């Protein structure tokens, strides 16, 4: 099995700097969850984290970079879970189970930070696809698809499975159309069902004829 590495891992830093970073990112995440990213200021984050506002600016520079740090923090946890975590999301489960677990977990991850991910994916038309996280997701899905259906175009199908989880479409379905998260996941299951081979079997009707 090809080993995957977590994308965008943090560089080594002093213990006190790392502690301050965790406090700031955690405080920012909580404030954003309550008020939305546009309503959160650096001053508020500093107060909630118990650090000086200068520390926040020195560490992150501006609010946009702080927002991306909140995304990255959650992203590293997600990547670690599907690369190193327990099955079925992590290694050790059959490929069809890992495929389903990954897409469900990615739906949960998108649900948790949909507005922030829309911001991150805005910009150039290919912004989403140039992100290192997308490349890792694509590689992971292509690997699993190659085990589920050897010989298929895994590169194309990996893109096809990731397309419904683009943050802007996901947010439109959840907020505008009012789709429950369970419905989104059921739709993903239907896509997977079209890819997972079904063993040949003989079905008998009540008359005794083989179908």
What are these regions, as identified by a protein language model?
Residues 118-122, 127-131, 135-138, 146-191, ...:
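Hydrophobic/aromatic-rich alpha-helical bundle segments in the mid-to-C-terminal region
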Residues 69, 82-111, 185:
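Hydrophobic alpha-helical connector segments
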Residues 47, 61-62, 72:
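Residue-level detection of the helix-turn-helix DNA-binding "recognition helix"
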Residues 67-74, 113, 117:
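Alpha-helical DNA-contacting segments of helix-turn-helix folds
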Residues 1-35, 39-48, 65:
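Basic, helix-initiating cap at the start of DNA-binding domains
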Residues 30, 34, 62, 84, ...:
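Conserved amphipathic alpha-helical interaction elements at protein-protein interfaces in regulatory
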Residues 50-60:
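Short hydrophobic/aromatic patch on the recognition helix
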Residues 17, 21, 71, 75, ...:
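Amphipathic, non-transmembrane alpha-helical scaffold segments
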């Amino acid at each position: 099995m090809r080993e995957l590495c977590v994308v965008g891992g943090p560089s080594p830093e002093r213990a006190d700097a790392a502690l301050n970073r965790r406090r700031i990112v955690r405080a920012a995440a909580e404030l954003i969850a309550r008020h939305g990213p546009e309503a959160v200021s650096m001053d508020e984050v500093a107060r909630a984290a118990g650090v000086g506002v200068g520390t926040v600016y020195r560490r992150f520079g501006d609010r946009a970079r702080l927002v991306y740090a909140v995304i990255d923090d959650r992203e590293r946890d997600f990547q670690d879970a599907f690369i190193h975590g327990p099955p079925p999301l992590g290694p050790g489960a059959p490929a069809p189970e890992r495929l389903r677990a990954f897409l469900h977990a990615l739906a949960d991850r998108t649900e948790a930070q949909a507005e922030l991910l829309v911001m991150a994916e805005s910009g150039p038309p290919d912004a989403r696809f140039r992100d290192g996280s997308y490349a890792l997701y694509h590689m992971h899905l292509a690997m699993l698809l190659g085990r589920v259906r050897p010989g298929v175009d895994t590169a194309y199908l990996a893109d096809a499975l990731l397309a419904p989880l683009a943050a802007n479409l996901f947010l439109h379905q959840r907020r505008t159309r009012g789709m429950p998260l369970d419905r989104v996941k059921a739709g993903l299951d239907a896509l997977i069902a079209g890819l997972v081979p079904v063993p040949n079997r003989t079905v008998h009707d009540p008359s005794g004829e083989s179908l």
